[in-house]
Design a protein with these regions (language model features):
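Proline/glycine-rich low-complexity loops and linkers
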Residues: 1-8, 16-17, 104-129
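Gly/Ser/Thr-enriched, mixed-charge loops and adjacent short helices
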Residues: 1-83
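Structural beta-strand/beta-sheet cores of well-ordered domains, especially the beta-sheet scaffolds
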Residues: 22, 96, 128-129
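General beta-strand structural signal in soluble alpha/beta enzymes
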Residues: 26, 51-53, 90-91, 108-110
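Short acidic/polar active-site loop segments enriched in Thr and Asp
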Residues: 47, 86, 128
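Solvent-exposed, flexible loop/coil residues
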Residues: 56, 64, 102-104, 112
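Short gly/pro/ser/thr-enriched loop/turn and capping motifs at secondary-structure boundaries
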Residues: 56-60, 97, 115-118
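Glycine-rich phosphate-binding loop
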Residues: 80-102, 107
Length: 129
């Protein structure tokens, strides 16, 4: 197995900006990602971004920042539906876990979106499936 080590930030941004205009709801959960989310969303030129709970506050006044708990995703689900977003993304407190909501407000679990991501990566590098 070949291990690929590469900084992908610029390549990732190129992929993101090549996609059709997309509307994204982000629930930062008052966690650490609040410190960098503006930089990330400012680089997504083809997106409309709706940020909720973006102010860093370790007391987590809106909900516990654990996107694996459905109750913690209720604000994001409402934002996706109310704003007719294409996708909703939520982070945990330190930004190392991701919660995903589809355009209908359904939770997309990690094993489901990892399968999609792995398929896309395999296609990028022409990896045999």
């Amino acid at each position: 197995m070949k291990i690929l080590k590469k900084i992908i930030t610029k390549d990732y941004y190129k992929i993101l900006i090549s996609i059709k205009k997309i509307k994204i709801a982000w629930d930062i959960g008052n966690g650490a990602m609040g410190a960098v989310i503006k930089e990330i969303t400012n680089n997504l030129n083809n997106s409309e971004n709706i940020l909720i709970n973006e102010e860093v506050d370790g007391n987590f006044p809106n909900h516990h920042p654990d996107p694996t708990v459905p109750k913690n995703m209720e604000q994001l689900i409402k934002s996706v539906k109310d704003n007719k977003c294409d996708i909703g993304l939520a982070f945990d407190g330190d930004g190392d876990r991701l919660g995903v909501v589809d355009n209908l407000g359904n939770l997309v679990w990690a094993d489901q979106y990892m399968l999609l991501l792995c398929t896309e990566i395999a296609n990028l590098y022409d990896i045999q499936k």
